[in-house]
């Protein structure tokens, strides 16, 4: 994925948000088969299907993760059940500290659902 495509989607975000996006993508791309798919207003992280969406905000990165059930954590700000066995879980990433083992565990689980 070209950095310029990522930077285009996040052009209106503060520079630290672009740094967060690049750091998160670098970690996620260590998983097998991950493709970063730029859309008009966001980025999708795909394996066979999308397992996460990265949405720009001025001061933060809004991450939407797929899961089998709602993720129970105070970090999750919104959960939407999209089918009997799938939920979308929304959280804000405002600093590099938020890209931690807990978050990566959720991403690994979402990645497995997209196999």
Segment roles from a protein language model:
Residues 1-115:
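Charge-dense, helix-prone N-terminal extensions
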